[in-house]
Amino acid sequence: MTHASVVDVLTGKYAVGTTQTVKGWIRTRRDSKAGISFLAISDGSCFHPVQAVVPNTLANYENEVLRLTTACSVEVTGVVAASQGSGQAFELQATEVKVVGWVEDPDTYPMAAKRHSIEYLREQGHLRARTNMVGAVTRVRNCLSQAIHRFFHEQGYLWIAAPLITASDTEGAGEMFRVSTLDMENLPRTPAGKVDYDKDFFGKETFLTVSGQLNVETYACALSKVYTFGPTFRAENSNTSRHLAEFWMVEPEVAFADLEDNAALAEAMLKYVFNAVLAERRDDLEFFAQHVDKDAIGRLERFVASDFAQIDYTDAIEVLKNCGKKFEFPVSWGIDLSSEHERYLAEEHFKSPVVVKNYPKDIKAFYMRLNDDGKTVAAMDVLAPGIGEIIGGSQREERLDVLDARLAEMGLNKEDYWWYRDLRRYGTVPHSGFGLGFERLVVYVTGMGNVRDVIPFPRTPRTAEF
């Protein structure tokens, strides 16, 4: 590619007086009475478009330039100049405008240059990336993704490709999508009348993964510091602003690490990626602060400047009981904290991110390490002001006998987890890890409010368009 990106022109990479070519799409066209048109051209490389000043002396000015509308694609060659306007430092004084693609009917173009509702944009999933808002979300999402990989790379972690197809239920909740090539109209049956999965592609019942954690643990128990970052799937019939059927998870696993190490890793990672987005995507964050959530930048700046508080679940319950606030969901020891409880702790009690740890075993997964009291497990949730839970993790149960007892307690067949149990039989080691729902992270950074609006093609109950 030999043409210049918009961001490079706007940030002064090219000297004034040099000739450059920009390729992109028209955001707006403005014509002056002096016979000059001003084209705002975007290529997605940054929030702001570059202005091309087009004189009426160009051969195609009358028959093409004056017909350009929002979303027409163009190649504009011109001389880089200091901008006379206040909106940007540099512009292009156009010497040539080539129209690459026209918009067939500007009057019916679904993404015309006006404010659209969030609901409308979801219906136009194939076109919504053309809007300022979704473009900004996409650049922020990319920045966060790259920062996560960079953080773990710099810390000496290895990225592991966890499988998307699995025979294991990590969470033990049973809310999984089945993967099968069997003919649904003519299912093979066993003598007992059950579906015969021996005849299926994998010779057994298989599912889309709900988490890469168990698989990644196998590598942590050999290579010490690993992580996975990829799509996961939950067949929860939840139509909420916090749930997707397909979403991305960041899941590190660390050998020889306890719950305190885990909490420290979570804090370091979150602060690293928030500092990255503050430094690298300021233009997009300013858009969110102006049009979506006025506290978008301030929230992140306060977060990275805060020391994380820590509190035991049992003590958190006492805080909630005695705070004088009436909650929709009553507080008692043994409940799973709801969003209102989490946000009270982070926003009103601590006024900072907080790690709640040592939860009742009955509300947590089988793989979490049983504490000495026999009632709680070494689990943690990181709660952030403005959203509540942003990370969930634990120290893993490394003792085979205790793991087997927990599997039995939860009605899970230990033979289904034979390979996971092998890790405890051959050089077992304390280890810890956590899961970060990536879309919730993007929601927190942008203030968008709904996970459906921060992933390109959201998958939710009864919705799988595009």
From Swiss-Prot:
Stated name of the protein: Asparagine--tRNA ligase
Family, as annotated: Belongs to the class-II aminoacyl-tRNA synthetase family.
EC number: 6.1.1.22
Localisation: Cytoplasm
Subunit and interaction comment: Homodimer.
Catalysed reactions listed for this entry: tRNA(Asn) + L-asparagine + ATP = L-asparaginyl-tRNA(Asn) + AMP + diphosphate + H(+)
Single Gene Ontology BP annotation: asparaginyl-tRNA aminoacylation
GO MF entry, a single one: ATP binding
One GO cellular component term: cytoplasm
Sorted UniProt keywords: Aminoacyl-tRNA synthetase, ATP-binding, Cytoplasm, Ligase, Nucleotide-binding, Protein biosynthesis
Keyword Aminoacyl-tRNA synthetase: yes
Chief location category: cytoplasm
Xref: InterPro entries: Aa-tRNA-synt_II, aa-tRNA-synth_II, aa-tRNA-synth_II/BPL/LPL, Asn-tRNA-ligase, Asp/Asn-tRNA-synth_IIb, NA-bd_OB-fold, NA-bd_OB_tRNA
Keyword match Nucleotide-binding: yes
CDD domains registered for this protein in UniProt: AsxRS_core, EcAsnRS_like_N
